[in-house]
Amino acid sequence: MKKTLVKSLYRETEKFIDKDIEISGWIRTIRDSKSFAFIELNDGSFFKNVQVVLDDKIENFKEIIKLPISSSLSVEGTLILTPNAKQSFEIKAKKISLEGNSSSEYPLQKKRHTLEYLRTIAHLRPRSNTFSAVFRVRSIAAYAVHKFFQEKDFVYVNTPIITGSDCEGAGEMFRITTMDLNNVPKEEDNSVDFSKDFFGKETNLTVSGQLSAETMALAFRNVYTFGPTFRAEDSNTSRHAAEFWMIEPEMAFAELKDYMDTAEELVKYIINYVLEKAPEEMAFFNSFIDKSLFDRLNNVVNSEFGRITYTEAVDILQKSGASFQYPVEWGIDLQTEHERYLTEKVFEKPIFVTDYPKAIKAFYMRENEDGKTVAAADLLVPGVGEIVGGSQREERLSVLEKRISEFGLNKEDYWWYLELRKYGETKHSGFGLGFERILMYITGMSNIRDVIPFPRTPGSAEF
């Protein structure tokens, strides 16, 4: 008999009524009396469990009812409708086979566990209700990203994880080396001789695929990359991780407005797709994680995102009369408290803040005519703050060279990026959307460690 997924039983119940089926899964709970028992079985294909009813006519009944939680079973039986019960159907078992026993020391018992505790058993936490929902939503959201861009004829490109350049110019990168750390080759001035290293130069884990994606956009027009990025920031906060995933589109013949239009459409698309494809998981989050979740998400998808300049934002904040931990003045990098005040108290919806001071933005962002600001825009959303950052890219060779020098970067490391400006350069724009950031927003989870399967943070690289 072909095995049936529990998801199919829920999505196509009519097809299986009074039919003999076989399912497999792990025991979530067992309730028994002398002559019959109820098993909640989960096979990983669906958020909900299926109830299996067995009686003492089952050959191994006494053995089965003594099994610990998380033991795995195969069940042959008949699907029976139960209109007057909590669940709409159940499986009347005819035969049950033990696939694998579980230790009685299995840590995920029926009681509720804290998120902090579950992080210590990251190899087992996907079996809990919360993380079953989180990681299924992560999968669905990732598919939505690809679906959105493929429907718009963007080309999916893979950018290097090992790089010799620093996209952000921040220097917070993980270094890669195969050199013997007990016998590092040195130059005459006692600096490290990277010419003796594997790649013959200093290399790092990428902080962004943007620069490489730009090269592809100037061949294919519209491209996107979606992959892991790494930041060696010693930031032990709920919003930062050393390894995370970024969605980074780049669009040729596109100005700042085009980036903002695309980013707004993408965010709404991902949220709507998850709401449609994961209704059970989203209902769980709204009930147990954030009771205002549906209201917040519906506000996002039904709003036309606002657009204000950085200068206007500073003016609004200064005139608000609100007390902020970080004082507001022109030239500062807006903090989360400022971003949330704008989105929650002033506009009550997502907004783009544009035209930031060039001193606080990356070297590749196009300098505006005022010489003080760049054509950059951050998307701020209620409850979180920034989730998207992007800009029109600097296409003028002389200006880009000047900006690289201002940042104290080595122009030779960017020779190929500069050369793009010599061969049919055009205006182009792009942005980065932190995948974990939008997952936190969609699920209501408040810590980035809880939306990535095996989080990498300062002092922690388990599993």
From Swiss-Prot:
Homodimer. Pfam families: tRNA-synt_2, tRNA_anti-codon. This is Asparagine--tRNA ligase. It is found in: Cytoplasm. Belongs to the class-II aminoacyl-tRNA synthetase family. GO terms for molecular function: asparagine-tRNA ligase activity; ATP binding; catalytic activity, acting on a protein; nucleic acid binding; transferase activity. The lineage of its organism: Bacteria, Bacillati, Bacillota, Clostridia, Eubacteriales. Coiled coil: none annotated. PANTHER family: ASPARAGINE--TRNA LIGASE, MITOCHONDRIAL-RELATED (PTHR22594:SF34), ASPARTYL/LYSYL-TRNA SYNTHETASE (PTHR22594). Keywords: Aminoacyl-tRNA synthetase, ATP-binding, Cytoplasm, Ligase, Nucleotide-binding, Protein biosynthesis. GO terms for biological process: asparaginyl-tRNA aminoacylation. CDD domains: AsxRS_core, EcAsnRS_like_N. GO terms for cellular component: cytoplasm. Its EC number is 6.1.1.22. The keyword Nucleotide-binding applies. It catalyses: tRNA(Asn) + L-asparagine + ATP = L-asparaginyl-tRNA(Asn) + AMP + diphosphate + H(+). HAMAP family: Asn_tRNA_synth.
